[in-house]
């Protein structure tokens, strides 16, 4: 993988995130917070899950989990939860921060570090992965859960539209994104 390729994919991911966030902004606070059996348990829960994965993978890549944390509770304490981000405004603010932080991380990579490995520890396991594999997994994970959020939003009459890479590329080529 090359830096320009991962930057293109993160450009797409940010574009798709903007579409889903714009649709979330159009639902009522009650719809946003409503529990549901679909996705991760509702729109807010699903969106926080996407954000948590972006956050967790970024801090993993930056070395936060190089050594084991004290216990399972210490790992749980690093996760983002609905009670900490109860409103859509809070989610959007944190999302923008995480996108900036991830972009800064990616901008500091070289082709060599992108293709290098990272070792990290999660409860009871030591893992090692290629950096770009983790970065790509963030995008794939977000794609899955954005589609779940999109289904919920569509049920509320607020479809975010399509998330196709070719749409992003066409908009980018025309200067719209």
Give residue spans per PLM region.
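An N-terminal RHG(E/S)-centered segment typical of histidine phosphatases
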Residues: 1
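Short, contiguous alpha-helical
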Residues: 7-22, 26-78, 121-177
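Acidic/histidine-rich alpha-helical segments that form the ligand environment
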Residues: 79-120, 128-152
